[in-house]
């Protein structure tokens, strides 16, 4: 096993990975029979011998985990998955957990780690709301990576569970934090929105959206800030709608498409079904809406400020910092919270903290 050098280079576990490909089942069967103890597997059916049976059998939960480790490995062998090892964190009956993964996944992770199939960095907790808090990080070890290489299935054989929720309701968020997902009862409007968005995602799935000039389906974004990578694949070519503050009238924006996370230069190179595209660009949309509300006309780029104010910064970085500050301020309750949220969004020693 290899030590995870950077636990922050990670993403949350995706609880909706799925595949019925026979070779996927064969790999999971091999891991199940060869590495998981009888205290987990039981004598038949993949359920433990004692205690209540999980809503989703252990072996199916193992399949979801292995598939997500496989996808993360394909994206980047260094990429880790964040997973909670606290039983209380698993909400089996949540609408945001359509496959009903449960705390039963915890002993599976421990068994795979003990068998040398995972690299694992334990989670940390420094107190409520502390910035150092994080969940356990896992990724495929060298031994599991070898099994992935030998497997007779490919990335396109890994899909998403059809019942995944795509209409998301979140509560009010604290500064610099994403609001928590809120359970809700469907109404006519949410049912209609879900059907409409499902049709849109079906259209995206039936289209080939790509940047033909890329050697690999990955784009590095914001290298001058905190570099991250945008992967171009089936998972990142789909959308969900997110509403805020436990209110169906708040936000409702579309998120998920990889094209939303790259700059205009990259977007100008997008092809759909081998045909070039033209983007209708609404510059400074949020600021323009505020101007319109005040009965004023916005002229020029609202994020373009005189270089004399930021002589030490490159123009491109200056614009990105100004834009981030403005958008943070729009969503803040007061100046002090806007400044604090802006500074906290950057890593230590970053220029954005100056």
Can you say where each PLM-predicted feature lies in the sequence?
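A short, conserved structural fragment
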Residues: 109-128
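Conserved catalytic core of nucleic-acid polymerases
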Residues: 2-59, 66-76, 102, 125, ...
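Short secondary-structure junctions and interdomain/linker hinges
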Residues: 115, 119, 204-221, 296-297, ...
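Acidic, glycine-rich two-metal-ion catalytic cores of nucleic acid-processing enzymes
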Residues: 135-318
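Helical catalytic core of nucleic-acid polymerases
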Residues: 34, 47, 81-102, 258-354
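Non-catalytic DNA-binding core/recognition domains of DNA-processing enzymes
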Residues: 52-71, 83-115
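Intrinsically disordered regions, especially transient/low-confidence alpha-helical propensity segments
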Residues: 15, 29, 70, 87, ...
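Minor-groove-contacting beta-hairpin "wing" of winged helix-turn-helix DNA-binding domains
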Residues: 125-139
